[in-house]
A protein has these predicted regions:
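Short, extreme N-terminal leader segments that mark the start of a protein/domain
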Residues: 14-85
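A contiguous, surface-oriented mixed alpha/beta subdomain in the mid-to-C-terminal portion of proteins
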Residues: 117-278
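Aromatic- and glycine-enriched beta-alpha-beta binding-site module
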Residues: 80-148
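N-terminal amphipathic/basic-hydrophobic helices that include classical n-h-c signal peptides
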Residues: 1-18
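Short, glycine-/Ser/Thr-/acidic-enriched flexible segments
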Residues: 75-76, 110, 211
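Short solvent-exposed loop/turn micro-motifs enriched in small/polar/acidic residues
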Residues: 62, 109, 187-190
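Short, basic/low-complexity N-terminal boundary segments at the transition from targeting/disordered tails
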Residues: 45-49, 88-99, 172-180
Length: 278
């Protein structure tokens, strides 16, 4: 049995919160970057060694249809929801051989790259930045991110759309933090260690993740339940709960050489697919 604890999930997420995906963060301004071109592609190789990413509550309904959403807890940040990408350390099973996203829904954390909005400056304004090491920067086939209009340098529609997305994502992350604080206040989280059994006898167990305790949820005081309902967070909760069974979908994409401990029972000769999550 391979015990895949999520200790490294936590470490990776702390690093991600510190923007380590962005190797060279460059604040954008109209003076220096008025001629900058950017070509956006669907190569997400920068996320290939990542097994979980932060996700906003508003994304739960779309993300839960395809893959698992869980919660993790680490000392400085508290509880946050994560989109599980792999069952082993440094593994993203949602990318194909060309580092394109395999599935319909791409998390906002991924979609925003190479842009990022950093903390407010001394004037209280958030600053839009870009990863200066992104391969698509200054590509001749790329689009200008600024344009001249009425004698002024202004964002192009491409950059405006990115800025709107960043503002919305940051706002949703703030709302999600309020949601997770409420879960902790209501004592609705419990730690789980789901076990995934493959038909060929390999087993994988995940530790260090949290889910909503449905038994406690059903016993919640009416006033608290109404707060969750009217805020829309009750829908988030049930989307999360439904998503946990999607760990099987991840297991079906494990490479054939992913090591596990075979069961002592005879091997199943059928197609090697995941058969259950205990």
């Amino acid at each position: 049995l391979i015990k895949q604890t999520l200790t490294k999930y936590r470490n990776q997420l702390i690093m991600q919160q510190q923007r380590t995906f962005y190797n060279n963060i460059l604040p954008l301004n109209t003076e220096e970057h008025k001629d900058l071109r950017l070509k956006i592609d669907n190569n997400f190789s920068i996320f290939s060694n990542t097994n979980a990413l932060p996700i906003a509550g508003v994304e739960f309904i779309e993300a839960s249809r395809e893959h698992a959403i869980a919660f993790i807890n680490y000392q400085d940040e508290g509880v946050i929801p994560v989109y599980i990408l792999g069952l082993r350390d440094n593994e993203n099973l949602l990318l194909d051989d060309n580092n394109n996203w395999k599935y319909r829904y791409v998390p906002a954390f991924v979609r925003r790259y190479p842009y990022i909005m950093v903390e407010p400056d001394k004037d209280g304004k958030s600053v839009v930045c870009i990863d200066a090491d992104y391969e698509g920067i200054n590509d001749p086939k790329g689009e200008l991110i600024f344009t001249q209009k009425d004698g002024e340098t202004k964002p192009t529609p491409q950059l405006e759309a990115a800025m709107d997305m960043l503002k919305d994502f940051n706002a949703q992350l703030t709302r999600t933090r309020e949601f997770t604080k409420r879960l902790e206040e209501y004592d609705l989280l419990k730690e789980i260690s789901p076990q995934i059994n493959l038909a060929d006898g390999r087993e994988f167990s995940i530790g260090g993740i949290y889910t909503i305790d449905e038994e406690k949820l059903l016993k919640l005081e009416d006033e608290k339940a109404l707060t969750l309902y009217r805020s829309g967070e009750m829908a988030w909760i049930y989307n999360h709960l439904a998503s946990i069974s999607n760990l099987i979908r991840l297991a079906e994409h494990l490479p054939a050489d992913a090591k596990g401990t075979p069961k002592k029972t005879k091997a199943v000769k059928k197609k090697k697919v995941a058969k259950k999550v205990a």
